[in-house]
Amino acid sequence: MLTHSSATDILTLSPAKGLRGQVSIPGDKSISHRALMLGSLAEGETTIQGLLLGEDPRSTAACFRALGADISELNSECVRIRGVGLGQLQEPADVLDAGNSGTTLRLMLGILAGQAGRFFAVTGDRSLRSRPMGRVVEPLRQMGASIWGRAGGTLAPLAVQGGSLKGIHYRSPVASAQVKSCLLLAGLLAEGTTQVTEPALSRDHSERMLRAFGANIQVDPETKTVAVVGGSRLVGQRVQVPGDISSAAFWLVAVSIVPESELLLRDVGLNPTRTGALRVLQEMGADIQIENLREMAGEPLGDLRVRSARLRGCTIAGDLIPTLIDEIPVLAVAAAFAEGITVIRDAAELRVKESDRLSAMAQELSRMGAQVAEYPDGLEIKGGIPLHGAEVDSHEDHRIAMSLMVAALGAQGSTLLRGADCARISYPDFIPTLQRLTASPLES
């Protein structure tokens, strides 16, 4: 049984008896953002198929429309963009609002910094205004950017005076695709070469897409360094967005923990910088098979067939973390149902996401009966202890909300989840799909 009150935003879930069928995974959020941005910066027309229709990409589209790009109505079939050219964004008449999207705000700062002679003000919702922006503002300032805001320019709202930039070699203290992508985008309009070296490889969607649009990009996997040469001309492209493996991960865990389940997840992006969760779940004993492996628009994808399985604990740390950072909340759910102990370390980044995801998962899984110890940079979860239904909260974080829905499917008794609607940020159809798979009537 699954009931949802839209008036109070409370979702009530009961244990599932088996999940069977097929699921089409929504478009990859990271790729959707980048396609909208590069299409807006390119000359000519860009078409995007399979765009994620969540709230975050809508925020990106709204910002770039305000900056002068001609973007058609968003849909998953085909979005058309008539770009303005790399350095030709217009000065908007109002504040640019990134909503809840850290990707929108951080990457946009890199783009706006080099728009010489124009002034921009950017902000976001309450959650985004509390998230750290210094990690991109500091290196942008080293390139010559003029950015001001609260707490020394480390918190939104922020003001940007576009100007001339110079390439730098930035050694990032953390493996962050957002930091890397922000600086590469700034480097498109900078004098000389901009290089970013990371301690571990982060997701590489920006590099792949920038190259496809015509940017002069070099990647050195051995030194974990990416370089872009300023002055490139971007040309509109056809972009096919694969399914988001971060969204697929909820179903991979749900099927693994609910007995007598089998799902086929179609057209899932399998970029090797994003498949850490897949590898970890297989190490834990999950029954996951990759079918119909192929490549589309420079991105590998395939179908995933997953069946119920007995899971065992493992260690998740080190260079694995950047490849599964968004999936850690639902991997914590898998750990609670696995035999033995699972240790998650090197994930302090999760404390400054839409919520403090480490604290949120420790708190909410504990309410359901899990034994969870919290570290400054991770969690230790003693699995194999049956979870029970409880009142839990999403912390207004889409990934926490969906992770707790998955946990409820395998728990004993009913679970009441407050703040379920935020799942729409990255997966608008998650609750309706869950309703279909559990054959539950949805009541508002």
Curated annotation (Swiss-Prot):
Q: Which GO terms describe its cellular component?
A: cytoplasm
**Keyword set, alphabetical order:** Amino-acid biosynthesis, Aromatic amino acid biosynthesis, Cytoplasm, Transferase
Q: Which NCBIfam families match?
A: aroA (TIGR01356)
InterPro entries in UniProt: Enolpyruvate_Tfrase_dom, Enolpyruvate_Tfrase_sf, EPSP_synthase, EPSP_synthase_CS, RNA3'P_cycl/enolpyr_Trfase_a/b
**What is the gene name?**
aroA
Q: Which residues bind 3-phosphoshikimate?
A: K29, S30, R34, S176, Q178, D326, K353
Q: What is this protein called?
A: 3-phosphoshikimate 1-carboxyvinyltransferase
PANTHER family from the UniProt entry: AROM/DEHYDROQUINATE SYNTHASE, PENTAFUNCTIONAL AROM POLYPEPTIDE
Which residues of this protein are catalytic?
Answer: D326 (proton acceptor)
Q: Where in the cell is it found?
A: Cytoplasm
Native organism? Synechococcus sp. (strain JA-2-3B'a(2-13))
Which of this chain's residues are annotated to bind phosphoenolpyruvate?
A: K29, G102, R131, Q178, R357, R399
